[in-house]
A protein has these predicted regions:
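Phosphate/pyrophosphate-binding loop motifs in nucleotide- or prenyl diphosphate-using proteins
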Residues: 1-187
Length: 187
């Protein structure tokens, strides 16, 4: 199978089910943001030394493929009710993220100030992933304002952003990198 079809050369793409839409459509923007997030997390995973953390990100990347597929499927909530939905994020995925957050937070000192994104290279990439995740979340929210979607992907992305923040902090802690604190300037 060839990677190119020329079918998108006029600015349209096919959703699951065959419907053709503009590449600028909110649904395409939403799953495109999720795809970008997945790529950023792949870069971060390549920089991680700890096998347990790499495994977490690999699990998340698989879930993001499921989420992208769900977003690329019009009427996914209705299809799910009829037992016709494909892979998708589940409540268990949100619970898993919460468990990982709780576990990693036991390694960290409580925050008393805002911190500046950065530190070890992997942590900096995770902070980048966190901000891309928030953008993806906003795109999915925007999609939900114009079309019927399951609210679970929004919850998943919200929790994932929290997880990426905590994971970045844990990576810095394990690397012995002090997190720079934000010090506001009075003007």
């Amino acid at each position: 199978m060839k990677i190119y079809t020329r079918g998108g050369d006029a600015g349209e793409t096919s959703l699951f089910g065959g419907e053709r839409v503009r590449k600028s459509a909110p649904r395409v923007a939403a799953y495109g943001e999720v795809d970008e997030l997945n790529s950023v997390l792949g870069i971060a995973r390549a920089e991680l030394e700890a096998a347990d953390l790499r495994a977490m990100l690999e699990t998340i990347q698989s879930s993001l493929f499921d989420l992208g597929g769900e977003l690329a499927t019009p009427n996914a909530p209705e299809r799910s009710a009829k037992g016709k939905a494909g892979p998708r994020v589940a409540e268990d995925d949100v619970v898993e993220l919460e468990g990982w957050i709780d576990r990693l937070e036991t390694e960290l000192e409580p925050l008393r100030n805002f911190i500046l994104p950065g530190g070890a290279r992997a942590a900096a990439l995770l902070h980048l992933g966190r901000t891309v995740c928030r953008r993806a979340e906003r795109a999915v929210i925007s999609l939900g304002e114009s079309e019927s979607i399951d609210p679970l992907p929004i919850r998943y992305l919200n929790r994932l952003s929290d997880f990426l923040f905590v994971l970045a902090r844990a990576v810095n802690k394990r690397a012995g990198v002090t997190e720079p604190q934000w010090i506001g300037r009075e003007r």
